[in-house]
Every structure is written in structure tokens, then in C-alpha cells.
Amino acid sequence: MCIRDSSESEPIIDFIDNNKIDLKYILNTHHHHDHIGGNLELKKKYNCDVIGFKDDKNRIPGINILVENNQIWQKGNFEAKIYHTPGHTSGHIAFHFFKEKIIFTGDTLFSLGCGRIFEGTYEQMFNSLKIFKKLPKDTLIYCGHEYTLKNSEFCLFNDPDNLKLKEKVLKIKNNHKLNSPTIPSVLDDELECNIFLKAEDIKTFSKLRDLKDNF
């Protein structure tokens, strides 16, 4: 088994031990503490490998497998293409399990949103989002945080005539009432409803990102 971004160890340990799972790999999308906080304890307990971007080798605790842009990482039954997606952080990556049509986008792409820009530039984030737009439309997107409801409100505020978005917002609100997750999302929906993916140029994207920071 592999896990993505071990924010903390205790709930992961409980799940692994209760289900008698053999943890082999931790996949880290970036170095922020809420994504790597459980690395060292999990590695110590299960002797698992920690995978991350080569330029973050001094920022990801326990890292022992370094990957780079466009590399195919393959171990056993696991096979993923690595995309370097800077913007949120300089060393951010995404893991695309292309056979399963699943991508772990970390804090670069959220459902109906994108990550804040901390270490990178608007242009880097804009170009990183372009990578996802080229994937098969039925790709399932597993992001680093479930900000879907708040993101949907921002998208609807800026794209009020989008009928597909209105339908999606209703589903999101219903999911929240039922305490059901909104993740994963489907790329096809994101292409139609996520205003950051719909931005056609860097100027439009930058304006939207600034507006979202203060929404």
C-alpha cells in the first residue's frame, strides 16, 4: 500500500493496524508540514520508503527516493508519472496513476479551485494548471484539501451564468448535508466549472487568484 501526504501519523497508524495493511510508500506532493507531518513516525514504524521531488530532498523528512519531472515511478503494482507543478511551492509535484486514471494534485489543483501561491509565481501556477487540462477528461482528481464548498461559492460569484456549475454547487451542498465527501472530482467537470482552469491567459488568472485570496 502507498499513501499520499501523511499530514499526521496517528490516524494512519490506526487505519493500517486495524486493517492489517502493509505500508510500502509515502508519496509527498510538497514539503508543507500539513503534508509531511507523519513521515518520520510512519517510516520508523513500518520501514516504508518516502518519495518526493529531488529539489525538496532537504525539506521532506525521511525522503529516500527522489523523483523528477516527467519521470515514470514504478514499484511493484504502482506506476505513476511525475509532474513538476510549481506555484504553491517551488518543489510541488503531482502523481498521475495513468492506468487507473487517477491523479494526486496536492495543493496545486483543488476541486473548483487552485492553491495559494507561496514560493512560485502566477505564471508558474498558470502553467502547472495547463498540465492537468491535457489529461483524459475522465481522470479522477484527488486534491490535498476539501475546500470544495467555499471554492464553489467563489466560482459561482464570478461565473453566475454557468448552468453546469449551478448543478454542481447543488450537488456539493447536498453532499455536505449528508456528510459525504466531494472528492474525488472529475476533470471533465473541473474544465467546465473551475474558473482557474477556464482562465485563458495569465492576466485573467492572476486577477482571479488575487480575488480568491481575499474572498
PLM region descriptions:
Residues S6-E8, H31, D55-D56, H88-T89, ...:
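Active-site metal-binding loops of divalent metal-dependent hydrolases
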